[in-house]
Amino acid sequence: MVKTVYITGYKSFELNIYKDDAPEVYYLKQFIAHKLKHLLDEGLEWVLIQGQMGIELWSAEVVIELKKDFPDIKLGIITPFIGHTQRWNDKNQAKYTNIIQQADFTESIHHTEYMGAYQFKQADQFMLDHTDYTILIYDDEQEASPKYFKAMLVEFMEKTNYTCDIVTFDELTDFINDLQWSQDQSFE
């Protein structure tokens, strides 16, 4: 039974998404909600993220929205270090502040500002050590920063009984096509 899931994947700019009202964001959020609802039906309690722009913050927004129907779901934001949003523009910082105000738990792995790339690796390892499952939205066809976490995840799974769902663009495309078809049918 999955009690705690870590959701991660592409940063928004790695998907060439620069606005939250882009149609792609809507579909990604619908997909994430779909995945989480299945896990909630099986006893999911916590969703953890590290607070990165893109898949992680969209997932946080989905969790906040799901709380209306699943009030027991909890959102935890565990950042690699303090001040990880300092270089973000005001709009993104305001969005992040709004999300953390609605989170059930917030903490940083390192209680310092950025010191080195090792902080990201240690935060990734923390997530693996403290969750039952990972949803990683990443496709080897579009290589980007999640490739480092994927390598760590695969190695971790080889040594443990940890499980994950690595979501490819094909799976996303199938979901979007099905969603669009069902929405078209509802208008007939």
UniProtKB/Swiss-Prot annotation:
Disulfide bonds: none annotated. Coiled coil: none annotated. It comes from the Bacteria. It holds the Pfam family YpsA. PANTHER family: UPF0398 PROTEIN SPR0331, UPF0398 PROTEIN YPSA. Belongs to the UPF0398 family. This is UPF0398 protein SERP1017.
